[in-house]
């Protein structure tokens, strides 16, 4: 299938050149105007390292993913909180936007917008959501600090282990993958999201980011109906004798943790930036409309993770970040062990990384 460029423009915002290439026509001009405003705002308030910004609007991220799979191992790229492993690239394909930049040369950055993902999420014609998303993506390179750099020296090692219950063996590879992704997000990559959100808030986009988070929480509430359908499907397996109630409880707990614990990375930065009103509004929505419908361990575990996110220092070494991450990992491992899952996971500092 051929890809056709339907819009090309070249603009100058202060000392920054903005180059726009789009496969989509509808809705692109308002998005470019928002992009101009964000570049202007950040470049006037803080150190802005970019002489140029490439702004790509793609119908989907298929071409980008093919390119990254070829080139990821050849450059020092920071992809908006992702490493570029196959699992991370697969997740990247469903993102509405991403900022890809070379950490060794911040003279420019590449913003990619995923048209289909934006449509699915309802963001495409929502100016506030677009502003929050773009401001967040541009904040990634601005938020680089000792702790975010230290995260690139850590890796997660998950030991193969037996499924806690024989009927779960067929699902255990998927379960282990979900948990590994969650641990990486909360214990290794957390700083990248926390500091990026904090820069976004302190850069003047707190209202737009809060509205974006409220919108996403509303979507989570809407999706609770899907969780109830899953409960019914699993109960049918219990009735057939394929699963026990304990096994169902473990599966639901893992799913709830994987979806909801990362919200701490979105809400804690409002506290860190002194915007407690927005943080309390988001937390109230969680506590009233979401947590009561989940496994009872999710709320307490979220509180522990969110408190740790508030305390994360910006000047951590790899060893210090590993220690911080292990505290969260130990709590997660302990909670899963109580439900019969013995997850063997370790955070390691790569040899030669600065301590």
Task: List each language-model region with its residue ranges.
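Acidic/histidine-rich, surface-exposed loop or edge segments in extracytoplasmic proteins
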Residues: 15-22
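Zn2+-dependent metallopeptidase catalytic core
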Residues: 25-55, 76-78
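Short, charged/polar micro-motifs that form catalytic or ligand-binding hotspots
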Residues: 25-28, 119-133, 182-190
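Active-site scaffold of zinc-dependent metalloenzymes
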Residues: 71-131, 138-149
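Short, solvent-exposed secondary-structure capping/transition elements
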Residues: 126, 143-152, 199-211
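Post-HEXXH active-site segment of zinc metalloproteases
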Residues: 128-129, 143-183
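An active-site-proximal "capping" alpha-helix that borders the catalytic cofactor pocket
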Residues: 185-206
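Pan-zinc metallopeptidase signature
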Residues: 199, 206-355
């Amino acid at each position: 299938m051929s890809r056709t460029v339907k819009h090309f423009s070249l603009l100058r915002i202060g000392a920054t050149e903005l180059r726009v290439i789009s496969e989509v026509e509808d809705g692109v001009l308002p998005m470019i105007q928002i992009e101009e405003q964000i570049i202007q705002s950040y470049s006037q308030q803080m150190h802005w390292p970019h002489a140029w910004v490439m702004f790509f609007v793609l119908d989907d991220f298929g071409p980008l993913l093919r390119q990254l799979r070829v080139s990821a191992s050849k450059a020092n790229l920071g992809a908006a909180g992702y490493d570029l492993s196959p699992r991370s690239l697969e997740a990247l394909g469903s993102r509405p936007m991403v900022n890809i930049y070379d950490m060794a040369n911040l003279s420019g950055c590449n913003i990619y917008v995923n048209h289909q993902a934006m449509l699915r999420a309802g963001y495409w014609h929502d100016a506030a959501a677009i502003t929050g998303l773009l401001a967040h993506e541009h904040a990634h390179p601005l938020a680089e600090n000792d702790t975010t750099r230290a995260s690139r020296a850590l890796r997660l090692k998950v030991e193969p282990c037996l499924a806690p219950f024989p009927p779960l063996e067929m699902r255990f590879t998927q379960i282990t993958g979900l948990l590994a992704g969650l641990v990486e997000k909360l214990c290794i990559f957390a700083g990248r999201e926390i500091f990026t959100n904090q820069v976004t808030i302190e850069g003047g986009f707190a209202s737009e980011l809060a509205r974006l988070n409220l919108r996403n929480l509303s979507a989570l509430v809407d999706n609770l109906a899907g969780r109830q359908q899953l409960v019914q499907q699993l109960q049918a397996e219990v009735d057939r004798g394929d699963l026990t109630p304990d096994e169902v409880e473990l599966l639901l707990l893992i799913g709830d943790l994987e979806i909801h614990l990362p919200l701490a990375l979105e809400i804690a930065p409002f506290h860190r930036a002194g915007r407690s009103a927005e943080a309390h509004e988001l937390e109230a929505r969680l506590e009233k409309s979401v947590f009561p419908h989940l496994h009872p361990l999710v709320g307490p575990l979220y509180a522990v993770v969110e408190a740790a996110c508030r305390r994360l220092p910006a000047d951590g070494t790899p060893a210090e970040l590993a220690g911080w991450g292990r505290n969260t990992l130990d709590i997660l491992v302990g909670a899963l062990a109580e439900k019969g899952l013995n997850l063997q996971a370790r955070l390691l500092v790569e040899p030669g990384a600065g301590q």
